[in-house]
């Protein structure tokens, strides 16, 4: 027997004349010895001897038609000379190990099969027999040489069709019957010769050991022949090749069938692992074209394809797996068979990892990181129990839906191309791909002369075709055909370059699992947890002992919690205890939380303690009043919520942070029975005492001591995913355009680390929030809405070393597959300058980030070399930048204001000098008139009346000139002010003016009313003779008349440049109107935000009141009364200065006639007459769109609105009912 350490052996099966040697490796006994083979076969077959084995290097054994190729020859290096061709007899004999065994010598069969020479000590046969055996041996060697030559010739001709030892499949199928018949004939002749020279005593044994050997053709029509067995005679005990297994005719057939099955199984494994067959390549080609057809079908109707994908996710996974198989086989074209086996193993492992990642797409985001789900109470730190309510959209936004789906540029194409021309263009394109695919398949098996000649011929034909096309016409295709060819090219390019990435992205994002499952299958739950009731929130008489429950008192409808209820959900109430005792800590006086039957939770010890104190109700009442909290639960809970969400990622990239989860109350009314009465209230109100969000501690590792001092900038990835947007060295997306020259010119950028991003958060956080709001479709700009969004973890911001930040505020890491899928055109990433190298200390609480926007923009422009020198003053905040033409307006306004202020101050301080100057000018004019009259008196008395009249005429002329000058100054000042206001009016003021004028048709009536009021005022002044008399009655009134009215008007106009042409410069303010203005200034920013509907309502009421007063004749009497009262007040002031009592004038009748007008002055106090408060033009238009009418009614409406707003702003925050 051979030693058990031999790894390669061949089992000899003697089947009456045919020697079929099966290598032990072909029956999966690669590491077993011969004894183990015998034991395995002896268990199922009849006993037989297994003592002779032939080395696998024997050419007869390896070249037998029943023996498959050795596994070592198939996986050997292609550079070795024996990798694909049969070895000769001499080389096989030289390399064969010595065939030696205890007491067994070599015989002539080993010489024939293994090519070994006869050694000394062996028995010699008669010379005639040796000659015949030598002749047969030469014939067999010639047959082997012929087989090798045919195999080499067929390998050179068929290039890529070779299978076993250089013999092609086609040649093997054609030559197999002839080779089998020739070998059987040679074996039979050899056995006949041996039988004639053998001893006679073994004929019965020969007949007993005879077997049936049958050969099958393709259709199973060949005959079965009975072959005479080989008799070995006395040499059977001395040989190793002829000693075989003892078989019966029944076991012989079953053994052959068993080994044939093992042989076919091994051949299939070898073909699949080592070298793909032609049929497998053709199936891959068909699958490639199937992907193109599926991409075109998706282009024609993307909705149906997405629906079918959602129905059967297994098909998409199978497609992605098959595409990865084809891509891996094409990539391994230049490798050897051993390397192809390793690549197949690696591709299979990558497919399994891809399938696992696609089946669990959000496993990284939903994992609890460093915290376990059942964390200890000290690790859990919750929020205060309030029901967070915000408006959520039912679906995703359009941008996020496009990001998650496999949308492409093919959707926007029109399907207007002709069907025939489109098919023709597609056939052309697919034939081109078929040629390239065929070249790839030929390259897998090696290049041959035929493939090279075919490639040269194809190149020559292509060049000739191009030259012929140039000679004919440059535009040979029609427009429709060009359009069809372009669409087919895009479809093929999509399937060729991005099919695998799209399939992977589809499997990753099409079944994105939200953090909170809001579907109908998620279910609803009734929240009935223990709530920490704080006695400090209730009156002093409420805390105490309840005899009915034998526990501390809970609010109505609530019961004390048992220890089991409290332990079940400690995270619902323990954070409240720790938050309350955060400053002073838990002590024995105030650190006890009462439970059912006076049991309590000890906050210092963090354990539940059973009560063993006295049972007296008075003592227990005192004990209950000293505690801070009582755990209570609802007797009948009406709080209906959804399920808890998954935990978010950690809130910080390093150090100690928090993870969050939440649940949402179900919207709808619920009923609860309280002492027989049914109370209807919403589920959100019922869930107010419970925690709707919880948090727990997490830690992703220690923070670095130092980081690079730099600034991270918000950038967008500009490199396509197919062009390699992922940077393997940085572990993130590529910053920049992807062009090295442009990136060097603009400034090389690299991704930021999480610590660098935290240090410069002020530079990019506003962009990140805006990106989250836009992607998630949130109208309400709230940080809580981002943190507790179900798809907030999908929108991400890329960082270095596979880090990313999502919209929930969580920091986590990609796996390599997710990172490559994330990096593409449009992805957001934080980048910094590559040249920054200074190191600064880092801490999560305090960072030395530069928050100055001017400095950041200046540094950015310097780094990108867009300007030579960036001035900080030139890049101020957007709110400080002036609009176009604003600089000139500002300078002119400043100059005009300065001049007006100087003139005003001079007139105010030098009032006496200015008055003296003006009086001297008037006196000089009067004296000149008197001189002229004196000279005229000397001419005669008859002209005396004329001289007196002349002096009076001169004085009247001077007075008229003064009045004319004052009126002219007023008109010019008003015109200048109006022109300045119109010139300096901004676009916003013009919009307000147009809006107010376009609200109603009242603006047209206002102009007519102003003209009427001006005419009525002039007529009222004519009817009041005291007005003209009072203007020139005192000398002190002259300078005030000349200077102060125009100067005051000009100063007011310069200060209030925003006043429009409808301002109140020609009308006076009443006391009620001034009080309304003061009230408006106090409440307008809080309570009154009137829209267009409110303004229309006020305008309507104002028009109705105006129409009623016009019918009663009110405006004329009201205006005349105001004009007379103004003159009376001026005369009263002058009388007080002169010591006069100042009796009533001629305007008493007008005052009495106007006593019925609304807003009369008699009922106003001195405080209401204060005119120090001034409104802007926009506020005046909002408050008084129709002038100064109905003031008291408007005040009443404003006060009512203020009270309503104050009442609605108060919301009860107490818990429970008394």
UniProtKB/Swiss-Prot annotation:
GO cellular component: membrane
Annotated signal peptide: none
Lineage: superkingdom: Eukaryota
Alphabetized SMART domains for the sequence: TSP1
Region (Disordered): 82-101, 189-240, 298-383, 445-471, 1129-1153
InterPro entries: TSP1_rpt, TSP1_rpt_sf
Pfam families named among the record's database cross-references: TSP_1
Record keywords: Membrane, Transmembrane, Transmembrane helix
Sections of the chain in a coiled coil: none
Domain TSP type-1 intervals: 638-704
Record keyword Transmembrane present: yes
Major place of residence: membrane
Keyword Transcription regulation recorded: no
Function per UniProt: Required for rhoptry secretion. Plays a role in host cell invasion.
Assembly and binders: Component of a complex, at least composed of cysteine repeat modular protein A (CRMPa), cysteine repeat modular protein B (CRMPb), micronemal protein 15 (MIC15) and thrombospondin type 1 domain-containing protein (TSP1).
Protein name: Thrombospondin type 1 domain-containing protein
Source organism (scientific name): Toxoplasma gondii
């Amino acid at each position: 027997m051979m030693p058990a350490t031999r790894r390669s052996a061949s089992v000899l099966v003697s089947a009456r004349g045919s020697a079929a040697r099966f290598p032990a490796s072909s029956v999966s006994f690669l590491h077993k010895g011969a004894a183990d083979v015998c034991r395995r076969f002896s268990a199922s077959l009849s006993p037989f001897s297994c003592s002779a084995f032939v080395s696998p290097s024997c050419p007869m054994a390896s070249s037998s038609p029943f023996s498959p190729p050795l596994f070592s020859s198939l996986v050997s290096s292609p550079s070795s000379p024996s990798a694909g061709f049969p070895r000769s007899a001499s080389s096989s004999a030289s390399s064969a190990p010595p065939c030696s065994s205890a007491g067994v010598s070599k015989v002539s069969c080993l010489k024939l099969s293994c090519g070994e020479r006869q050694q000394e000590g062996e028995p010699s046969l008669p010379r005639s027999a040796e000659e015949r055996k030598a002749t047969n041996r030469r014939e067999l060697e010639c047959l082997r040489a012929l087989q090798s030559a045919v195999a080499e010739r067929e390998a050179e001709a068929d290039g890529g069709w070779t299978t076993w030892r250089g013999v092609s499949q086609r040649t093997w199928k054609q030559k197999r019957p002839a080779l089998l018949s020739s070998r059987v004939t040679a074996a039979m002749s050899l056995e006949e010769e041996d039988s004639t020279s053998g001893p006679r005593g073994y004929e019965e044994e020969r007949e007993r050991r005879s077997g049936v050997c049958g050969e099958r053709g393709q259709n199973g029509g060949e005959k079965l022949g009975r072959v005479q067995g080989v008799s070995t005679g006395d040499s059977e005990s001395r040989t190793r090749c002829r000693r075989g297994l003892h078989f019966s005719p029944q076991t012989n057939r079953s053994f052959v069938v068993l080994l044939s099955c093992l042989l076919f199984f091994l051949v299939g494994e070898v073909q699949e692992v080592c070298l793909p067959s032609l049929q497998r390549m053709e199936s891959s080609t068909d699958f490639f074209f199937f992907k193109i057809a599926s991409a075109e079908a998706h282009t024609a109707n993307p909705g149906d394809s997405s629906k079918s994908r959602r129905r059967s996710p297994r098909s998409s996974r199978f497609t992605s797996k098959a595409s990865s198989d084809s891509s891996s086989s094409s990539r391994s074209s230049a490798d050897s068979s051993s390397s192809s086996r390793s690549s197949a193993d690696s591709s299979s492992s990558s497919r399994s990892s891809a399938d696992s990642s696609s089946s669990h797409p959000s496993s990284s985001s939903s994992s609890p990181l460093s915290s376990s789900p059942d964390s200890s109470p000290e690790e859990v730190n919750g929020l205060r129990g309030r029901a967070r309510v915000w408006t959520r959209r039912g679906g995703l936004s359009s941008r996020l839906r496009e990001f998650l789906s496999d949308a492409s540029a093919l959707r926007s194409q029109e399907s207007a191309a002709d069907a025939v021309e489109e098919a023709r263009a597609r056939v052309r394109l697919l034939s081109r791909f078929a040629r390239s695919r065929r070249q790839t398949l030929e390259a897998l098996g090696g290049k041959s002369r035929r493939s090279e000649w075919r490639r040269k011929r194809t190149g020559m034909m292509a060049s000739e075709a191009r030259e012929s096309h140039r000679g004919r016409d440059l535009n040979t295709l029609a427009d429709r055909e060009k359009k069809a060819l372009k669409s087919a090219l895009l479809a093929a390019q999509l399937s060729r370059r991005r099919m695998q990435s799209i399939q992977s992205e589809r499997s990753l994002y099409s079944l994105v699992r939200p953090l909170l499952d809001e579907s109908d299958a998620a279910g609803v739950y009734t929240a009935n947890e223990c709530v920490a009731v704080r006695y400090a929130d209730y009156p002093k008489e409420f805390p105490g002992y309840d005899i009915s429950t034998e526990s501390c008192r809970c609010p109505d409808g609530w019961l004390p919690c048992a220890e089991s209820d409290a332990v079940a959900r400690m995270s619902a109430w323990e954070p409240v205890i720790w938050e309350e005792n955060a400053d002073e800590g838990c002590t024995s006086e105030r650190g006890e939380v009462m439970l059912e039957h006076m049991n309590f939770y000890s906050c210092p010890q963090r354990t539940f303690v059973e009560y063993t104190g006295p049972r007296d109700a008075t003592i227990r009442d005192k004990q209950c009043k000293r505690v801070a909290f009582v755990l209570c639960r609802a007797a009948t809970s009406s709080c209906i919520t959804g399920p808890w969400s998954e935990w978010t990622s950690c809130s910080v990239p390093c150090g100690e942070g928090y993870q969050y989860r939440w649940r949402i109350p179900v919207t709808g009314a619920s009923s609860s029975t309280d002492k027989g009465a049914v109370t209807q209230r919403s589920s959100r109100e019922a869930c107010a005492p419970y925690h709707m969000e919880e948090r727990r501690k997490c830690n992703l590792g220690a923070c670095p001591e130092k980081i690079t001092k730099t600034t991270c900038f918000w950038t967008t990835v500009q490199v396509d995913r197919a062009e390699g947007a992922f940077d393997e060295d940085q572990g993130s997306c590529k910053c920049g355009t992807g062009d090295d020259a442009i990136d060097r010119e603009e400034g090389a950028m690299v991704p930021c680390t999480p610590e660098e991003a935290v240090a410069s958060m002020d530079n990019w956080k506003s962009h990140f929030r805006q990106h989250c709001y836009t992607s998630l479709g949130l109208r309400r700009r709230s940080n809580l809405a981002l943190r507790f969004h179900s798809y907030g973890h999908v929108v991400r911001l890329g960082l270095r070393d596979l880090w990313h930040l999502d919209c929930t505020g969580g920091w986590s890491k990609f796996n390599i597959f997710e990172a490559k899928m994330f990096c593409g055109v449009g992805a957001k990433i934080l980048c910094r300058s590559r040249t920054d190298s200074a190191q600064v200390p880092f801490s999560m609480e305090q960072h030395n980030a530069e928050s100055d926007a001017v400095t950041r923009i200046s540094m950015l422009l310097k780094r990108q070399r867009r300007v030579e020198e960036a001035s900080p003053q030139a890049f101020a905040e957007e709110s400080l930048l002036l609009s176009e033409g604003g600089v000139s307006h500002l300078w002119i306004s400043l100059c005009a204001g300065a001049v007006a202020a100087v003139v005003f101050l001079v007139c105010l301080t030098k009032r006496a000098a200015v008055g003296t100057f003006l009086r001297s000018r008037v006196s000089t004019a009067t004296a000149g008139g008197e001189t002229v009259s004196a000279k005229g008196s000397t001419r005669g008395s008859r002209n005396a009346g004329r001289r007196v009249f002349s002096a009076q005429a001169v004085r009247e002329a001077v007075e008229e000139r003064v009045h004319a000058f004052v009126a002219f100054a007023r008109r010019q000042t008003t015109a200048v002010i109006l022109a300045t206001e119109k010139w300096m009016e901004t676009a916003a003021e013009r919009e307000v003016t147009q809006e107010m004028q376009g609200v109603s048709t009242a603006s047209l009536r206002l102009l007519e009313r102003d003209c009427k009021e001006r005419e009525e005022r002039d007529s009222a002044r004519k009817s009041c003779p005291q007005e003209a008399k009072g203007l020139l009655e005192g000398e002190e009134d002259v300078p005030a008349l000349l200077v102060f009215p125009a100067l005051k008007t000009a100063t007011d106009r310069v200060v209030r440049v925003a006043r429009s042409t409808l301002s109140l410069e020609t009308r006076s303010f009443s006391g009620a109107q001034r009080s309304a203005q003061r009230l408006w200034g106090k409440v307008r920013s809080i309570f009154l935000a009137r829209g267009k509907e409110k303004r229309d309502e006020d305008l309507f009421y104002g028009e109705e009141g105006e129409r009623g007063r016009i019918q009663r004749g009110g405006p004329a009497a009201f205006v005349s009364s105001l004009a007379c009262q103004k003159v009376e007040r001026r005369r009263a002031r002058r009388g007080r200065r002169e010591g006069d009592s100042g009796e009533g004038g001629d305007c008493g009748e007008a005052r009495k006639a106007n006593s019925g007008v609304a807003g009369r002055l008699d009922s106003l106090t001195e405080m209401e007459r204060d005119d120090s408060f001034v409104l802007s033009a926009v506020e005046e238009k909002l408050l008084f769109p129709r002038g100064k009418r109905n003031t008291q009614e408007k005040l009443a409406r404003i006060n009512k609105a203020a009270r309503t707003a104050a009442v609605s702003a108060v919301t009860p925050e107490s818990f429970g009912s008394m």
